[in-house]
């Protein structure tokens, strides 16, 4: 999914980085579960991983919806595993799941729910500008915040716009600035046309 948004016909780099970060987190979670299995003398049984039903996600909104449902399914599986551990009197596994997985899942689901609400309110996917702004202002800012907390990384990014003080502007200021950048060249063209008309007349 991450590399879909890195393609030249999608070109939404912060969607790309967001999904790549999610993929890395899930791989780390799988490694933690396998390490716990080995630590406790168990055996790891691997199963086939089914490929996604769709090869292209068409829009950032559809990709976010797909991710949201996947995260809810993962959360449900973890809850069922927690219930099984509790029924079999395994407090260590219960504690491991609560501290390392379930709390993080709740935060991820809440975050994705907020992203979906914002995309719908902005008119995605019909309004192409909505996904562009969401990519730059929401995902870009959240990745900057993550980078500030964890330090510079290979996938870190700078804010779209920032005043001389270095802190990023509020979203509405970013939107206003982008609007002005798109309108000012048009005004300059109109003025040059008007001057040309006056000169010719």
UniProtKB/Swiss-Prot annotation:
Pfam families: Ferritin. One of its GO terms (cellular component) is cytoplasm. The keyword Chloroplast does not apply. GO terms for molecular function: ferric iron binding; ferrous iron binding. Residues 1-123 form the Ferritin-like diiron domain. One of its GO terms (biological process) is iron ion transport. The keyword Kinase does not apply. Keywords: Iron, Iron storage, Metal-binding. SUPFAM superfamilies: Ferritin-like (SSF47240). Belongs to the ferritin family. This is Putative ferritin heavy polypeptide-like 19. It comes from Homo sapiens (Human). The gene is FTH1P19.
């Amino acid at each position: 999914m991450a590399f879909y948004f890195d393609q030249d016909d999608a070109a939404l780099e912060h969607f790309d980085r967001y999904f790549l970060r999610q993929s890395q987190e899930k791989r780390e979670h799988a490694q933690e579960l396998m390490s716990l299995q080995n630590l406790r003398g168990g055996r790891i049984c691997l199963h086939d991983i089914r490929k996604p039903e769709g090869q292209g996600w068409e829009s950032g909104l559809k990709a976010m919806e797909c991710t949201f449902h996947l995260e809810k399914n993962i959360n449900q599986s973890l809850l069922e595993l927690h219930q099984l551990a509790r029924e079999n009197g395994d407090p260590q596994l219960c504690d491991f799941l609560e501290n390392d997985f379930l709390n993080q899942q709740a935060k991820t689901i809440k975050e994705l729910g907020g992203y979906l609400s914002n995309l719908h309110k902005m008119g995605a996917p019909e309004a192409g500008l909505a996904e562009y702004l969401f990519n730059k202002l929401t995902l870009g800012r959240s990745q900057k915040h993550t980078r500030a907390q964890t330090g510079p990384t290979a996938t870190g990014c700078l804010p779209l716009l920032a005043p001389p003080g270095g802190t990023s502007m509020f979203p509405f200021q970013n939107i206003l600035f982008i609007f002005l950048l798109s309108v000012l060249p048009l005004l300059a063209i109109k003025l040059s046309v008007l001057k040309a008309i006056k000169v010719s007349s």
